[in-house]
Amino acid sequence: MVTPVQGLGHTLQMQVVEATPERVVMTMPVTAQHLQPWGYLHGGASVALAETAATAGAFLNCPAGMVAFGQEINANHLRSVREGLLTATAIPLHIGRTSQVWEIDIRNEQQKRICVSRCTLAVIKSDAPGATK
């Protein structure tokens, strides 16, 4: 299953490869629109990929009528990238009633880790479309 993502994820060309409550795998190509002025992957693009993967997994763990919103995210950028396909793998560290914490590992096509991130999400009640599973 490869599924495109909406919103910012769509703009950055992210795709969902796997999505379960225990693990989310997403990809994002590195193209000119993902680069900072010096020709390397913009750190914000990595963080957007990390939070998108964590949010997808968190939503799969939310009860009906609840959604997950990013509350805090950190990222360590370990290796620079100029092109290629990135793969983010998000796994839950904590699934609570009102919060979740996810760890996201982002690797390049050579399976070298380029970024590691941790994202905390608030679980809140919502009447937004799509909040009911």
Regions found by a protein language model. Name each.
Residues 1-133:
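Terminal targeting signals and extreme-terminal segments of soluble enzymes
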